[in-house]
Design a protein with these regions (language model features):
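Short HxH-centered metal-ligating active-site micro-motif
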Residues: 118, 122-207, 214
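Accessory alpha-helical/coil subdomains and C-terminal extensions
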Residues: 242-243, 247-258
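C-terminal segment of N-terminal export signals and the immediately downstream linker at the start
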Residues: 49-84, 88-92
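Polyanion-binding loop/helix "lid" in catalytic or ligand-binding cores
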Residues: 193-238
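N-terminal short beta-loop-beta anion/metal-coordinating cradle
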Residues: 89-125, 129
Length: 258
């Protein structure tokens, strides 16, 4: 969600944003009916791949990332291109679009915030069919989000889930402010506050509390996802990594959170 910080894209060498995969938590059941309904495979006469590996898209030479490490490296390379104004805007040509009409092979699920300044496909310089993105204010989880992530991992064989928070998150700021004031937010926004509240860092004050809570919230959401039994089983076998990361509006860098 938007807060009042401004962003600009910096140029210059920065630390590698994803210094290696760290698998965190495989169900083998295949939900054919769900797969068919969500992709239109029945009408098109084509099913989805059961793994995250696939041949290179038309017009590209590199194969799709098929492991957590490969996926992390691709996201890191894409973010480097983004923050240095060297974007490729890959996988947008007519041949790719025709291929994607019958199947998809995304290599990462990105659970991010709805903030308009942090679109995952741009931040990681990826194109059509590369990322499965799920976005909620403050990366808040609910049943729809859990089901969406599970679909990507269990049905499409995606090897990487990234929980992506960001600097100056408005949802986090609102949660911190509501807790301090005791105000009950209108409509469904109170749900966001209730979900973010456990991550609030009471050891800091002011903007430092908000900033620390952004990172703490990412870690909390990541740990909840990693604890999902079917995701944990895939992680245990090395087929999946669930990681937390944070996007800095002022530098445009994505950095891995331990």
């Amino acid at each position: 969600m938007n807060s009042h910080a401004t962003s600009h894209r910096g140029i210059g060498p920065e630390p590698h944003p994803f210094p290696g995969a760290r698998p965190t938590t495989d169900g083998t059941a295949r939900r054919t009916l769900l797969r068919t309904a969500l992709t239109g495979a029945a009408a098109l006469g084509a099913g989805l791949a059961a793994t995250g590996t696939a041949t290179a898209d038309p017009g590209t030479a590199a194969p799709r990332p098929g492991t957590p490490d490969e996926a992390l490296r691709e996201l890191a390379a894409g973010n480097r291109r983004w923050r240095t104004y060297r974007e490729r805007h890959p996988h947008e040509n007519p041949a790719v679009r025709r291929t994607l009409a019958t199947s998809q092979h995304p290599f990462a699920v990105v659970l991010g915030c709805i903030d308009s300044r942090v679109p995952p496909e741009l931040v990681f310089d990826q194109g059509l069919g590369d990322l499965m993105t799920v976005r909620t204010a403050g990366e808040v989880l609910d049943e729809a989000v859990l089901g969406s992530v599970a679909y990507g991992v269990l049905e499409l064989g995606i090897p990487l889930v990234v929980v992506l928070g960001h600097q100056s998150c408005g949802a986090v700021r609102a949660a911190v402010a509501a807790e301090q004031s005791g105000e009950h937010l209108p409509a469904h926004m109170q749900y966001l506050v209730d979900q973010i509240r456990p991550a609030i860092d009471h050891g800091k004050e002011g903007d430092a509390r908000i900033d620390a809570t952004v990172s703490a919230n990412v870690r909390l959401v990541r740990s909840r996802l990693a604890a999902e039994p079917e995701l944990a089983a895939r992680t245990a076998t090395g087929k999946l990594a669930v990681v937390g990361a944070r996007y800095e509006l002022t530098t445009q860098a994505v950095n891995r959170l331990a």
